[in-house]
């Protein structure tokens, strides 16, 4: 079973992430940041990952530390659940539309952290959520999961739709990349023999 639980405690946040990469999309989310919970729900449902996230952070200041640290802890949990990466497909991509918005996400479990985030948001906030925090979430994930991640919003007018298509596409790309390939069972998906 590809499951993991990671706890991260700092002076700013206390985070717990538990996941099952081979789940059905069940989720239990309580980050204290409602829009982040909504986006994590997209990852769980579209990635078919069972996901529990509990977070307590200094949201009286703002949501930055909570959002970033949830990304970090989720990245650590995914890396732990995958383990040595034997048999995974490694690469995943997805295009997801939502009305006028369309986003593309491509991921590589390369072991080389890298983020290309190109989302021309049409406004700075979605409700009380600062859209710039989405970059911090994905940067935290990338650096701790050891992945290369390309995120492109190709079109969109509604910022909520823009970001929701990003998170849905991320969930679907993640699902494809961590899927086990029976034909490559026990093999590292690299000509180097390691990732």
From Swiss-Prot:
<dbReference type="GO" id="GO:0004424">
    <property type="term" value="F:imidazoleglycerol-phosphate dehydratase activity"/>
</dbReference>
<comment type="pathway">
    <text>Amino-acid biosynthesis; L-histidine biosynthesis; L-histidine from 5-phospho-alpha-D-ribose 1-diphosphate: step 6/9.</text>
</comment>
<keyword id="KW-0963">Cytoplasm</keyword>
<dbReference type="GO" id="GO:0000105">
    <property type="term" value="P:L-histidine biosynthetic process"/>
</dbReference>
<dbReference type="InterPro" id="IPR020568">
    <property type="entry name" value="Ribosomal_Su5_D2-typ_SF"/>
</dbReference>
<dbReference type="InterPro" id="IPR038494">
    <property type="entry name" value="IGPD_sf"/>
</dbReference>
<keyword id="KW-0456">Lyase</keyword>
<keyword id="KW-0368">Histidine biosynthesis</keyword>
<comment type="similarity">
    <text>Belongs to the imidazoleglycerol-phosphate dehydratase family.</text>
</comment>
<dbReference type="InterPro" id="IPR000807">
    <property type="entry name" value="ImidazoleglycerolP_deHydtase"/>
</dbReference>
<dbReference type="GO" id="GO:0005737">
    <property type="term" value="C:cytoplasm"/>
</dbReference>
<keyword id="KW-0028">Amino-acid biosynthesis</keyword>
<dbReference type="Pfam" id="PF00475">
    <property type="entry name" value="IGPD"/>
</dbReference>
<protein>
    <recommendedName>
        <fullName>Imidazoleglycerol-phosphate dehydratase</fullName>
        <ecNumber>4.2.1.19</ecNumber>
    </recommendedName>
</protein>
<dbReference type="InterPro" id="IPR020565">
    <property type="entry name" value="ImidazoleglycerP_deHydtase_CS"/>
</dbReference>
């Amino acid at each position: 079973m590809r499951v993991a639980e990671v706890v991260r405690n700092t002076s700013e946040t206390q985070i717990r992430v538990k996941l099952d990469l081979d789940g059905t999309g069940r989720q239990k989310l309580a980050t204290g940041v409602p829009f982040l919970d909504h986006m994590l729900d997209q990852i769980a449902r579209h990635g078919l990952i069972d996901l529990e996230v509990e977070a307590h952070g200094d949201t009286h200041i703002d949501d930055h530390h909570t959002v970033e640290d949830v990304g970090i802890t989720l990245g650590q949990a995914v890396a732990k659940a995958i383990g040595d990466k034997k048999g995974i497909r490694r690469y995943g991509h997805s295009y997801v539309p939502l009305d006028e918005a369309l986003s593309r996400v491509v991921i590589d479990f390369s072991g080389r952290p890298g983020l290309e985030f190109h989302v021309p948001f049409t406004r700075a906030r979605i409700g009380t959520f600062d859209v710039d925090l989405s970059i911090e979430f994905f940067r935290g994930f990338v650096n701790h999961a050891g992945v290369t991640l390309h995120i492109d919003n190709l079109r969109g007018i509604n910022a909520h739709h823009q970001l929701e298509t990003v998170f849905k596409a991320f969930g679907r790309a993640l699902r494809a990349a961590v899927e086990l390939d029976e034909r490559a069972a026990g093999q590292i998906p690299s000509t180097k023999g390691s990732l």
